[in-house]
């Protein structure tokens, strides 16, 4: 396929739509066909909402297999962290803007049953990395595990010993792949939508080790997803807490955090198909609109990759 070159406008305008329509577009397989068509024809957003591709395709360093989560390193622009999903070692990989491997840091005391996402956010000791071992394709009832450790440096031999926290969904189990942490320390999960509605859940804080906490439902984001490409696979919050990005295999939605958490105001959304990702799994966003997308890939022929976008986020 032909990718847009650096600096080319990726989407002339992000489409601003009514909240119900925004949810249909995030989970496009839901709802009547007429609704989906109406969303597709929604007028372009007013104002400076636009994203452009800066780097359309970056191959990640060879040790990275089946990348499943991503976070931007706040100390070094252009550096990001990722990890593999189930079957991979409990390791964080630090990579440069062009995918070059900067470090391989085991998470001490952790195991990788099915790591799905990661986030960087505040903790009692300063700034920590949160790794979510929450994969649950069968949506059975089970403990979800969150590991927390101070953010390492790329050259560290291992993280400090990770704290382990456990929680469960009340009632039936759910599959979730998106996690984000806000500046005040609130931790949120987004369910995938394959076995039930796409939902936003809060992990109770302060985190409590040695017990199993109960997750708190915040709101439904969309009905159950009917198409593979609309499953929610990643989430990320900007360091200033103003923006939350959610992604599916084929779409990106950027919310004002306050809107996502309860007001129901519109999201800004865009189609990711032009990037040609192979199983897009992760998203991370900076306060200035720098946005990272990571795809898992498949085997040696389509390894894990990343793309960099720059989005002009409204200041008001």
Identify the meaning behind each predicted range.
Residues 9-10:
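Short, positively charged and aromatic/hydrophobic N-terminal segments
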Residues 30-316:
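Sequence/structural signature of beta-propeller domains
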Residues 2-3, 15:
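Position-driven detector of the extreme protein N-terminus
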Residues 14-37:
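Secretory targeting and sorting signals
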């Amino acid at each position: 396929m032909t990718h847009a070159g650096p600096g080319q406008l990726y989407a002339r305008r992000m489409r601003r739509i009514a909240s119900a329509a925004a949810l249909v577009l995030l989970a496009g397989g839901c709802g009547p066909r007429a609704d989906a068509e109406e969303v597709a024809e929604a007028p372009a957003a007013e104002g400076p909402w636009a994203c452009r591709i800066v780097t359309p395709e970056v191959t990640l360093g060879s040790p990275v297999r089946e990348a499943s989560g991503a976070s931007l390193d706040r100390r070094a622009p252009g550096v990001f962290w990722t990890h593999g999903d189930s079957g991979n070692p409990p390791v964080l990989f630090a990579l440069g803007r062009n995918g070059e491997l900067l470090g391989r840091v085991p998470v001490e005391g952790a195991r990788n049953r099915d790591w799905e996402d990661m986030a960087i956010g505040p903790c009692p000791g300063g700034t920590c990395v949160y790794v979510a071992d929450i994969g649950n394709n069968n949506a059975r009832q089970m403990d979800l595990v969150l590991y927390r450790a101070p953010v390492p440096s790329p050259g560290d031999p291992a993280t400090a010993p990770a704290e382990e926290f456990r929680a469960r969904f009340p009632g039936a189990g759910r599959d979730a792949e998106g996690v984000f942490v806000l500046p005040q320390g609130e931790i949120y999960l987004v369910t995938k939508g394959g076995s039930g509605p796409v939902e936003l859940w809060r992990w109770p804080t302060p985190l409590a080790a040695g017990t199993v906490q109960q997750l708190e439902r915040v709101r439904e984001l969309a009905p159950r997803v009917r198409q593979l490409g609309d499953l929610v696979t990643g989430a990320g919050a900007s360091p200033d807490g103003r923006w939350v990005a959610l992604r599916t295999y084929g779409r990106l939605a950027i919310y004002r955090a306050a809107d996502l958490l309860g007001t129901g105001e519109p999201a800004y959304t865009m189609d990711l198909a032009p990037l040609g990702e192979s199983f897009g799994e992760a998203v991370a966003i900076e306060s200035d609109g720098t946005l990272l997308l990571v795809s898992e890939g498949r085997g040696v022929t389509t390894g894990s990759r990343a793309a960099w976008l720059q989005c002009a986020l409204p200041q008001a």
